[in-house]
Curated annotation (Swiss-Prot):
Annotated keywords: ATP-binding, Cytoplasm, Disulfide bond, Nucleotide-binding, RNA-binding, Transferase, tRNA processing, tRNA-binding
Recorded name of the encoding gene: mnmA
Enzyme Commission code: 2.8.1.13
Assigned protein family: Belongs to the MnmA/TRMU family.
Taxonomic source organism: Bartonella henselae (strain ATCC 49882 / DSM 28221 / CCUG 30454 / Houston 1)
Protein name (record): tRNA-specific 2-thiouridylase MnmA
Function, in words: Catalyzes the 2-thiolation of uridine at the wobble position (U34) of tRNA, leading to the formation of s(2)U34.
Taxonomy of the source species: Bacteria, Pseudomonadati, Pseudomonadota, Alphaproteobacteria, Hyphomicrobiales
């Protein structure tokens, strides 16, 4: 059977492809490439939010000027283009959970939630309703045939690798999705945009958290979850109250800058005691993480979960999109996934994603991932954290005395 460039049967003109057009360079080039090859291309842009200043902010996406840019590109290509209002859905599926997660002391990754719900569930369903054979996006990731299905692989351009944000894609979605930029470097994509005459050829790349004006995520969280800005105290792991804070929303595990205390010692946020509004700080070595426990795991590997090896599977994992994969061993016992690092990781916060790969090479296959619920650190660190957390009554008394001496700003 003849397969076209998207691994679909038949000639390109016999395949209808919906392209998710954000108004940026990447998705515009995808639409241009597919149109040039002869596919029946339909562009769809999702209006996800309209938050005043964010609408025209450099680096924003899916609002205001971006919609106009997508429309202009579609006109240049001569393809149909539709704008769908998904603001309410985006708020419910992405923004509200993002704020709730931060209020619980987690470090969420909203782009993953957006891909899970709005883009690869709702938009994909719309593409099927339009009788499209595939949904194509401008993500930098590769997909190709793997047995009876398709699998995800890290892209050619490792600097643009977006596999971390796509681990939650289900097998059914992977089979329907196409990623034409997976084998192209970003520099070449920009050249193509210029060659195609797109007005977006020199447009800035969108930021990770697209709905946050000027990167001030605390403003949105303060509005949606005011309890996250309750004042509290900053406590050293030795139990000493060092200072005050104006809300745990301003802190994340591993943070060093902007903690708000000066002791002459290099201090990092090592734990957030959300219930008691306490920020626990300590030396960097207390951030060394040996084991993770995960929730909401999407497993894309070949091994059946009911036949998972008792001693686990060695693989590479990423706990941040900007970090390289590190070797670890994945375990699955009694419905619980856990990860043992072969070399300790640093600054792993609840809510972060942990993504699995079959190796640490540039073209490694994505095996899924999950979200961190909690971690285990060195035995001494665990003991010190338990001690300061159990010493709540004493710490609270000291904190009350401290508050009488210092006024909150």
């Amino acid at each position: 059977m003849f397969l076209n460039s998207l691994d679909l049967p038949g000639q390109p003109e016999n395949s209808r492809i919906v392209v998710a057009m954000s108004g940026g360079v990447d998705s515009s080039v995808v639409a241009g490439l597919l149109k040039k090859e002869g596919y029946d291309v339909i562009g769809i842009t999702l209006q996800l939010y309209d938050h005043g200043a964010a609408t025209h902010r450099v680096g924003a996406c899916c609002a205001g000027q971006d919609i106009e840019d997508a429309r202009c590109v579609a006109e240049t290509l001569g393809i149909p283009h539709y704008v769908l209002d998904y603001e309410e859905r985006f708020r419910e599926a992405v923004i509200d959970p993002f704020a709730a997660s931060y209020a619980h002391g987690e470090t969420p990754v909203p782009c993953i939630a957006c891909n899970q719900t709005v883009k690869f569930a709702d938009l994909l369903a719309t593409a099927r309703e339009l009788d499209a054979d595939a949904l194509a996006t401008g993500h930098y990731i590769r997909s190709r045939s793997h047995g009876a299905h398709r699998a995800l692989f890290r892209p050619l351009d490792s600097d643009r690798d977006q596999s971390y944000f796509l681990f939650a894609t289900t097998q059914e979605q992977i089979d329907y999705l196409r990623f034409p930029l997976g084998d192209l470097p970003k520099a070449r994509v920009r050249e193509m945009a210029t060659e195609m005459g797109f007005v977006v050829a020199n447009k800035h790349d969108s930021q990770d958290i697209c709905f946050v004006p000027q990167g001030k995520y605390s403003d949105i969280i303060t509005k949606l979850r005011p309890e996250a800005v309750n004042p509290g105290v900053i406590v050293h792991v030795d139990g000493q109250v060092l200072g005050k804070h104006s809300g745990i929303v301003h802190y994340t595990v591993g943070q060093r800058r902007g903690i708000g205390v000066a002791t002459g010692e290099a201090l990092y946020v090592v734990y957030l005691d959300v219930e008691n509004a306490r920020v626990i700080v300590g030396p960097r070595e207390m951030l060394e993480t040996h084991k993770l426990f995960l929730r909401d795991v999407n497993w894309l590997g070949d091994e059946r979960l009911d036949n998972f090896p008792p001693d686990g599977i060695e693989m590479a994992v990423k706990v941040r999109s900007t970090r390289p994969p590190h070797l670890a061993r994945l375990h699955y016992q009694e419905g619980v996934f856990s990860v043992d690092f072969l070399e300790c990781e640093n600054s792993v916060a609840p809510g972060q994603a942990c993504v699995f790969y079959d190796g640490n090479s540039d073209g490694a296959r994505v095996l899924g991932g999950g979200f961190v619920t909690h971690s285990e650190r060195a035995a001494e660190t665990e003991m010190m954290l338990k001690r300061v957390l159990c010493n709540l009554e004493t710490t609270s008394a000291v904190a009350s005395e401290f508050k009488t001496k210092v006024s909150y700003t």
